[in-house]
Amino acid sequence: MVIGAFRCETQQFRYDVLDVKYFRHPRFRSKEYLKQASEIVFQLLSKLELGKDERIQVCRGYIFDEAVESLKEMYGDDRIERIAVTGEPQRLTEIAYMDEIRNLGYEPVKERDEKKAKSFFHMMNWLRNNPEKLIYAKTGWPRLQRYHLFRSYRPRQTRE
């Protein structure tokens, strides 16, 4: 998952990737991805070198709830605002995401935003044809277990 940070005034953009391991069993179930997303948000804001009274707008997505609570504790309620990300920040984050998945060898369907189901099955078929890439798939969602491809995937247990 790509997390982006954008400063409108200067058009600065930074991003980082939330490791897929947080979206697999057992980490997914314990929601470790929330803490990691929060850490990435703080790292990105540090790289942007926030001004003393600069407002911070954060995507309304659930994954940022923990980050927002920590930001409010650190900067105060008045500086933090939840928003629907659109425009240039959305475009740049989407480009970063596309670059990351293309680096894995996957070419997404062109109309992926309009046809989410088609996009999902396109990616699932790509994984079926490239099983070595399953290590990059977010397999923690219980509903994915209805698909044979994900039922048969058992990640190696590692200590991290």
State where each predicted segment sits.
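RNase H-like, Mg2+-dependent phosphodiesterase core
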Residues: 1-160
